[in-house]
Amino acid sequence: KLVSSSDLSSGLAVICAWASWNYESTDQLRYIQRAQKKSQGRLKTVSISVDASRRDCKNVLDRDSISWPNICDGKIFESKPIQLLGLTSVPDNILIKNGKIIARSLSTADLQDTIEKNL
Protein backbone atom coordinates (compact mmCIF):
# COMPACT_ATOMS: atom_id res chain seq x y z
CA LYS A 1 0.00 0.00 0.00
CA LEU A 2 1.26 3.45 -0.88
CA VAL A 3 1.20 6.12 1.81
CA SER A 4 1.21 9.84 1.14
CA SER A 5 1.60 12.81 3.43
CA SER A 6 -2.14 13.45 3.11
CA ASP A 7 -2.75 10.08 4.81
CA LEU A 8 -0.98 11.48 7.88
CA SER A 9 -2.39 15.02 7.76
CA SER A 10 -5.34 14.50 10.09
CA GLY A 11 -5.51 12.91 13.50
CA LEU A 12 -2.54 11.27 15.20
CA ALA A 13 0.16 9.37 13.33
CA VAL A 14 3.48 7.79 14.19
CA ILE A 15 6.35 7.05 11.84
CA CYS A 16 8.89 4.72 13.37
CA ALA A 17 12.27 3.30 12.40
CA TRP A 18 13.11 -0.20 13.57
CA ALA A 19 15.26 -3.26 12.85
CA SER A 20 14.79 -6.97 13.45
CA TRP A 21 18.15 -7.13 15.24
CA ASN A 22 17.24 -4.43 17.77
CA TYR A 23 15.05 -5.69 20.62
CA GLU A 24 14.12 -2.21 21.86
CA SER A 25 12.81 -1.25 18.42
CA THR A 26 10.76 -4.44 17.97
CA ASP A 27 9.37 -3.90 21.48
CA GLN A 28 8.37 -0.37 20.45
CA LEU A 29 6.64 -1.80 17.35
CA ARG A 30 4.62 -4.15 19.55
CA TYR A 31 3.64 -1.23 21.82
CA ILE A 32 2.54 0.83 18.80
CA GLN A 33 0.50 -2.13 17.58
CA ARG A 34 -1.32 -2.35 20.94
CA ALA A 35 -1.90 1.42 20.95
CA GLN A 36 -3.23 1.30 17.41
CA LYS A 37 -5.71 -1.46 18.28
CA LYS A 38 -6.79 0.38 21.43
CA SER A 39 -7.28 3.62 19.47
CA GLN A 40 -9.85 1.94 17.19
CA GLY A 41 -8.31 3.41 14.05
CA ARG A 42 -7.47 6.87 15.38
CA LEU A 43 -3.69 6.19 15.41
CA LYS A 44 -2.16 5.88 11.96
CA THR A 45 1.19 4.15 11.63
CA VAL A 46 3.97 3.79 9.09
CA SER A 47 7.17 1.96 9.93
CA ILE A 48 10.53 1.87 8.21
CA SER A 49 12.84 -1.09 8.69
CA VAL A 50 16.58 -0.54 8.46
CA ASP A 51 17.25 -4.24 7.95
CA ALA A 52 19.57 -5.22 5.10
CA SER A 53 17.44 -8.32 4.59
CA ARG A 54 13.81 -7.96 3.53
CA ARG A 55 13.25 -11.51 4.74
CA ASP A 56 14.32 -10.60 8.32
CA CYS A 57 11.95 -7.63 8.19
CA LYS A 58 9.06 -9.72 6.88
CA ASN A 59 9.64 -12.41 9.53
CA VAL A 60 9.15 -9.87 12.34
CA LEU A 61 6.09 -8.32 10.68
CA ASP A 62 4.54 -11.77 10.18
CA ARG A 63 5.46 -12.99 13.68
CA ASP A 64 3.90 -9.96 15.35
CA SER A 65 0.95 -9.70 12.90
CA ILE A 66 1.84 -6.13 11.95
CA SER A 67 -0.21 -5.07 8.96
CA TRP A 68 0.25 -1.29 8.66
CA PRO A 69 2.42 0.09 5.83
CA ASN A 70 6.10 -0.75 6.29
CA ILE A 71 9.07 0.22 4.14
CA CYS A 72 12.03 -2.13 3.87
CA ASP A 73 14.22 -1.44 0.88
CA GLY A 74 17.35 -3.17 2.24
CA LYS A 75 19.37 0.05 2.15
CA ILE A 76 19.70 0.31 5.93
CA PHE A 77 20.30 3.98 6.91
CA GLU A 78 20.91 4.91 3.26
CA SER A 79 17.18 4.46 2.66
CA LYS A 80 15.65 7.57 1.13
CA PRO A 81 12.69 7.76 3.59
CA ILE A 82 15.07 7.42 6.56
CA GLN A 83 17.24 10.24 5.26
CA LEU A 84 14.36 12.51 4.24
CA LEU A 85 12.73 12.17 7.66
CA GLY A 86 16.00 12.62 9.58
CA LEU A 87 15.67 9.32 11.43
CA THR A 88 19.13 8.43 12.71
CA SER A 89 18.87 5.42 15.02
CA VAL A 90 16.68 2.50 16.03
CA PRO A 91 14.29 2.80 17.55
CA ASP A 92 13.43 6.26 16.32
CA ASN A 93 10.08 7.90 15.75
CA ILE A 94 8.16 10.96 14.70
CA LEU A 95 4.75 11.72 16.18
CA ILE A 96 2.44 13.82 14.00
CA LYS A 97 -0.85 15.44 14.99
CA ASN A 98 -3.03 17.06 12.33
CA GLY A 99 -0.09 17.22 9.93
CA LYS A 100 2.36 18.84 12.36
CA ILE A 101 5.28 17.13 14.10
CA ILE A 102 4.62 17.27 17.84
CA ALA A 103 7.49 15.04 19.02
CA ARG A 104 10.37 12.97 17.76
CA SER A 105 12.93 10.45 19.01
CA LEU A 106 10.85 9.52 22.06
CA SER A 107 11.62 6.56 24.27
CA THR A 108 8.93 3.89 24.27
CA ALA A 109 7.64 5.13 27.66
CA ASP A 110 7.51 8.76 26.48
CA LEU A 111 5.93 7.69 23.18
CA GLN A 112 3.27 5.81 25.14
CA ASP A 113 2.52 8.83 27.35
CA THR A 114 2.41 11.24 24.41
CA ILE A 115 0.14 9.00 22.33
CA GLU A 116 -2.26 8.51 25.24
CA LYS A 117 -2.43 12.27 25.89
CA ASN A 118 -3.11 13.07 22.24
CA LEU A 119 -5.67 10.43 21.28
Regions found by a protein language model. Give the residues of each.
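Signature tryptophan residues that serve as conserved aromatic anchors
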Residues: W18-W21, C57, W68
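Conserved hydrophobic packing residues within short motifs/helices of P-loop NTPase cores
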Residues: I15, V46-I48, I71
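Short active-site neighborhood of thiol/selenol oxidoreductases, capturing the structured segment around
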Residues: V3-T26, I32, K44
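Proteins that catalyze or organize thiol-disulfide redox chemistry
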Residues: K1-L2, D7, Q112, K117-L119
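Thiol/disulfide oxidoreductase modules built on the thioredoxin-like
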Residues: I66, D73-N118
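Solvent-exposed loop/turn segments at secondary-structure junctions
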Residues: S20-N22, D51-R54, I101
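N-proximal helix/coil linker or "cap" segments that precede and/or mark the start of modular domains
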Residues: K1, S6-S10, R55, N59-D62
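Structural microenvironment flanking redox-active thiols in thiol-disulfide oxidoreductases
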Residues: T26-D64, I76-I82
